C-alpha cells in the first residue's frame, strides 16, 4: 500500500517507548507505523521527534480584550505559538478577557473573537462566579464548554465591569451542585483569601 504521506526516519513516540521508524498517513489518519513505508509524499524526519499533538490544559487568551489586558496574548499569536511547540489543542481559561466567560452571551463573544484566527483546536472552560448561579452554568454547558473554573482567593479587577470574580463559600457550594449535574469537571484555584491578601 502507498499512503498519501509517509514521515520517514523520525524518532516516533509510541505507547511502548521511542523508536526510529516511519509513519504512514492516509486521509489525515495514521494507517501504519513501521520500516520502509512508501507514500506519494515523503517527509524526511531524520533527527526530529514524531509524536502525537500535545494538549495544554491551561491557557489564558485575552481576545476580545478589555481593560488593561488588550496587549496580552491573543488568538493569533497564542495559537501560533502552540502550533510551533507541538500543542495541537488547548483548553482556554474563562478569565483575563472582558467579559469573563460565565454565561451564554460571553461564551458567544469569545467564540466570535476566535473566528478565522485559530491555528490549533481550542476548548473552553466556563467560569463559576457568584453572578452566574441562576442559569449561567447551564448556559455554558449547553454552549459546549469542556469544564469549569473558579477562584477561592480574591481575583479580578472590581473596577472593570464583566471581569472574573472569585466565589465565596455559598457560591462555591451552589456552583459545585450545578456543575455536578453537567457531568463535567470543576477546576478550583485554591487559595485562602485572608492569607493571600496579607
Predicted regions and their residues:
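Short, acidic/polar
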Residues: 71-79, 130-140
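Histidine-rich, glycine-flanked metal-binding segment
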Residues: 1-53, 67
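Short, well-ordered coil/turn segments that N-cap beta-strands
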Residues: 87-88, 116-124, 144-146, 182-184
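Divalent metal-coordination and catalytic microenvironments
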Residues: 10, 28, 47, 58, ...
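Alpha-helix-loop-beta-strand connector modules within alpha/beta enzyme cores
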Residues: 51, 104-120, 169-188
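Histidine/acidic residue-rich metal-binding segments in metalloenzymes
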Residues: 132-198
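Hydrophobic faces of well-ordered beta-strands that scaffold small-molecule active sites
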Residues: 53-59, 90-92, 122-126, 148-150, ...
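Metal-associated gating/positioning segment near the N- to mid-region
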Residues: 48-113, 117
Amino acid at each position: 500500500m502507498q499512503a498519501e504521506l509517509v514521515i520517514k526516519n523520525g524518532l516516533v513516540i509510541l505507547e511502548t517507548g521511542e523508536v526510529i521508524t516511519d509513519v504512514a498517513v492516509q486521509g489525515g489518519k495514521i494507517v501504519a507505523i513501521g520500516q520502509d513505508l512508501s507514500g506519494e509524499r515523503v517527509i524526511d524526519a531524520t533527527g526530529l521527534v514524531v509524536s502525537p499533538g500535545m494538549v495544554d490544559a491551561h491557557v489564558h487568551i485575552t481576545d476580545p480584550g478589555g481593560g488593561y489586558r488588550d496587549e496580552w496574548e491573543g488568538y493569533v499569536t497564542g495559537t501560533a505559538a502552540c502550533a510551533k511547540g507541538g500543542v495541537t489543542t488547548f483548553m482556554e481559561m474563562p478569565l483575563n478577557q472582558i467579559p469573563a466567560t460565565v454565561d451564554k452571551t460571553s461564551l458567544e463573544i469569545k467564540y466570535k473573537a476566535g473566528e478565522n484566527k485559530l491555528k490549533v483546536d481550542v476548548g473552553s472552560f466556563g467560569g463559576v462566579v457568584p453572578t452566574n448561579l441562576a442559569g449561567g452554568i447551564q448556559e455554558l454547558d449547553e454552549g459546549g464548554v469542556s469544564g469549569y473554573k473558579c477562584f477561592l482567593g480574591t481575583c479580578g479587577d472590581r473596577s472593570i465591569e464583566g471581569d472574573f470574580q472569585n466565589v465565596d463559600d455559598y457560591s462555591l457550594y451552589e456552583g459545585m451542585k450545578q456543575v455536578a449535574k453537567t457531568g463535567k469537571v470543576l477546576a478550583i484555584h485554591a487559595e485562602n483569601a485572608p492569607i493571600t491578601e496579607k
